[in-house]
Amino acid sequence: MTISSKISSDFDKQSALKVITGLNNFNIPQIKQMALASEIAKVTYLDIVADTDIIKEVESVSKIPICVSAVKSKELLKCQKTGVNILEIGNYDCFYEQGRLFHSEEIKLISKETRNLLPHATLCVTLPHILKIEEQVKLASDLQRIGIDMIQTEGKSTSISKTDHLSGMIQKSASTFSSTYTVSSKIRLPIISASGISSLTSPIAFLYGASGIGIGSNIRRLQDIGSMVIYIYEVQAAISSNHNIQQNINHSIQSSKISHQLIPY
């Protein structure tokens, strides 16, 4: 795996944050805004559609590390030649809206083909939420054997969750967190939680074993760079606060005279 030290460090510290512009988003002005906001807020990397023209547009305004997402290995191959940092098979939401579903065998086939074409690229694969938890664990294990570098979990798609905004976000985040918790306990790859992640829910992802999170829909609703930066800062503050709480709890337990009485679970 070839990955920048900044990205690797953020994953190691369980503080990686990526901004997702969307697999079906070709709105260049909006993508540029999100790229600039991400760079100002110092997010780990930006996740965009696998399109060489959009890569050029982003690179014209920002030096932020780039991940490109697609479901076809040839599209990823084209983008890899531009020097992007991460290639991702995933972001299926726009396909779910069309009734297009992805199952384990197809994901493995695409992953094998991509790895064979690009043996040294950093590859991430999203586990489809339509799979049962045990199927997601099996797929993640198979992907680890194929040589995939990172796994992303997702929640129920917006086309399936026909609820109000807050309820839908909670439902989606609960779904991706349950996948993150189970998968992270079975494999040794970094896990990214995405879908329904907000400043409210982001700390939970790391408690459940995530090495990073992806946010997108809440940022795309904002109209200017300043608002986007403020929202990203809110998420980062929530993550930082959670890490401080974890450190304090761990320190208190380790220094406590009754720590041996605690029951591990």
Swiss-Prot record:
InterPro entries in UniProt: Uncharacterised_Ycf23
N-terminal signal peptide: none
Cited Pfam families = DUF561 (PF04481)
The record's GO CC annotations read: chloroplast
Locations listed in the record: Plastid, Chloroplast
Keywords tagged on the record: Chloroplast, Plastid
Concerning its family, UniProt says: Belongs to the ycf23 family.
Give the protein name, as stated in the record.
Uncharacterized protein ycf23
Species the sequence originates in: Porphyra purpurea (Red seaweed)
What gene makes this protein? ycf23
